[in-house]
Amino acid sequence: MEAEKETEQEGNLTVMKLPVLPTKPNTHSHSMSSPIHSSISASVPFSWEEEPGKPKQHSTSSSSSSSSSPLTSYSSSPFETHKSLELPPRLHLLEKDGGSVTKLHSPITVFDGPYSMTTSKRMDSPSFRMMVKGSADCYGSFRSDIDGDLEDLEVGSKQQENLSSGSLAVVKKRGRLGFFGFRRRRALKGKTEFGRGSYVFPSSVDRESEYSRKEEEEEKEDKRFGYDDTDGISCSQSSRFCDVKISSISRTGSFSTLPAPPSSSSKSHFWTNVYAGLKQVVPWKSKKTTV
């Protein structure tokens, strides 16, 4: 009875079977001609192609242009909008002002910077300039403004203040007359700039009109004081320009007051005294000869 019940229970149970998956061999043909997914990559054409490997054909282009590379045919397309490069900021300023950009500035404006629209012919950066004119005139300066605003500096009482504060001081240098009324050579004309560190630099020489004007003023002053360009100038007139005190040399003695040179007898007396002193200090031994 028990065996029959077991067979009935087994018949009522449903047997679940696992699905069998189809097995495929894991073999790939690694050929160098085409990749694994060649169909997917070939279906995406480039922007200048209608289909992969087929460039776009244009009715306006000739047969010679159609036979050229796809890049040139795409660039000559009338339907495409070409994007040009943007102008630099300094050219944008010209367009805003209503000017044309047909003629660009010369490369000299590189010194003024990319955003500077000034038309200055000289660079406004600190520099040292040196120029030699004539036989003895030498000029040079350390200045940031070459055109120069040194005319506005005061001469006189501000000289000591400028030297103490470390700034440049402008001193008017006459250099007309020397000692005893003789005319000395003027090596430095115009103005002289004094800087700290015991460096002396004469001023710049781009002022020919200024020098000529100074020459005329000096000539007028010479005529006003009563002398001309000749060298026959009195010492009183030269003292107007150079305050020089010449101390007189006083003679404190003469050749008669000098002691007379010692005679030969005094010399011999001196050496005898020296010899006597040496004999007292150094013991002298007399050599006795034995017979």
Curated annotation (Swiss-Prot):
Low complexity: bias regions: 28-43, 59-78
GO biological process: embryo development ending in seed dormancy; regulation of DNA-templated transcription
GO molecular function: DNA-binding transcription factor activity
InterPro entries cross-referenced by the UniProt entry: DUF688
Region of interest (Disordered), residue spans: 1-82
UniProt name for this protein: Uncharacterized protein At4g00950
Source taxonomy: Eukaryota, Viridiplantae, Streptophyta, Embryophyta, Tracheophyta
